[in-house]
Amino acid sequence: MFSIIIPTFNNLEYLKICIGSIKKNSEFEHEIIPHINEGTDGTEDYLISKNIKYTITKYNSGICEGMNKAAKKATTDYILYAHDDFYFCPGWDTELKKEVDKIGHNDFYLSGTMIGTTGIDTLDCGTNINNFNEKKLLDNYQKLNFYDFQGSTWAPHLIHKDIWNRVGGFSEEFYPGTGSDPDLNMKLWKTNVRIFKGLAKCLVFHFGSVVTRRNNDDIKIKTESGNKGNKIFLLKWGITIKFFKKFYLRSDIPYVSELTEPKKAMNYLFSLILCKINYLYVKYIYNFK
């Protein structure tokens, strides 16, 4: 059904939970393809023992390069990007398949809904593998009441492999990965994709970016004036991620229909001017490279 690509960086115990949840809670059979960054924690031996195909770099290639390498091994028609600290709840794949069948073409970007202590819907079933309460999650996830939402940019996301290849996958200049999701959305927008939909009943529990928290002071992720990925996006596209999500993707409001071009009202024009001022500052005064 889907090729599930999972970049992982020395995070074996969480990866085991992620893969286990896919095997346990999926209605359909899926292809699982992790990309191992470094793999000094025994990840490669584990995947070999489970007969799971993978790609590997002996360095931390980040999310983008890892995704692109692993996606080349995909043999299904659909690429699904997942974090290694996800737990996939029952029914996740049936919801995606129903939506794909309903759309009837390949020009879409679909995502699930992350739940947890920091997700869109909160359900405290633990913050790490040591206090994870799987039973509580399985007993309560169906009680959550959320809506299908507009303008998703988050994992787990699903796109057709032809569309993935059309835009070249993730842009590797966003190493180690921050900002690469909205950049992918922008590339899809430029190729006339207008369905960006988050599905309320496609649920994954997220432990909360375990690896990012472990490395959140890395200069490759942050600069002294904020997030590096935001600056790369601004210099590449001439607008901020916040502007793109607000006026183009109209993120997080209830989903109604596929998107149209943004209305260029006063609020749009004023915000666009601020983007251009920010662009000039970052490029010529801050001299970000």
Language-model segment annotations:
Residues 127-150, 154:
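Short, flexible, basic/aromatic active-site loop/helix in glycosyltransferases
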Residues 2-14, 18, 25-26, 35:
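A conserved hydrophobic helix/loop-capping motif in glycosyltransferases and polysaccharide synthases
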Residues 150-168, 173-203:
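A short, conserved alpha-helix in the catalytic core of glycosyltransferases
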Residues 57-74:
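Glycine-rich, basic loop-to-helix element that forms the pyrophosphate-binding segment
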Residues 79:
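Short aromatic/hydrophobic "clamp" motif used to bind/position activated sugar donors
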Residues 115, 175, 197-220, 232:
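Active-site donor/metal-binding and catalytic loop motifs
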Residues 21, 28, 36-45:
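A conserved acidic beta->alpha catalytic loop
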Residues 90-128:
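Conserved donor NDP-sugar-binding/catalytic core segment of glycosyltransferases
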